[in-house]
């Protein structure tokens, strides 16, 4: 009898826990509305952030000060966003803010970048691909081997034979240690694809928190300490090969910093974006840059913060905040499900 009561208690407990997960999950799928926001873009003509929302048949757009403009002025007030249309119609300005407008420069100076929290919490590859940075025929090609970071060395493995290339591994390990790299590496970030304009290798965070650049030039190791860790504690890095080679990628710091790792006459420099404190575990980041200005959007479950930045200094010129609208799930879950189980993070999906 006691055994039956024990089993019955376990079944009730299991059913209760299961209902705390299944029922809320089904209700959330049926009622949850994903938070969507209008497109934000800094206008080089208005010198202000513009709110562009043509959803639902809306034919107007406005700026951050509340001024509303007709749809017919959309292209002319945002010439750097709609340059193709204006050039096709022959009405693109020759200069904006004293800067000559040339199609090639517009393309080269364009920056498009997006980061999501899932990028950081997703399983990271344990092996990397180091391309030749100065290929003889100009095109990036697969090197035929992969590397992995060990406790006290870097190891290159031949892709065909699955054997370790002892000479190459020793050559790169000795050079890394010579330049001050402390094993084991905490993390390493790169862009292992041939579909990129050029090769800058990998950026590796060593055991002391120093960020190093590692690449292969003429089949020889190139290792250099960026020293950006002297000014910012590196929490995460994302490679982003800019067309104009201005920066190597985006750096997220341990104290909420977000900015770019910039090329600086053969050295490196961290340029912080003048935005609110950024948490890569919770916040999304989108950057739309042109020849004069950057529009930076930071989004989380609380809302959207948008910034217009000077391209050269990344200093703030304008800012705007939009609160997240509560959907049906947000309104009902507070009282319908005061507590429930979830096996995924709302920020990352993992």
Language model segments and positions:
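Hydrophobic membrane-insertion alpha-helices, especially the h-region
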Residues: 6-25
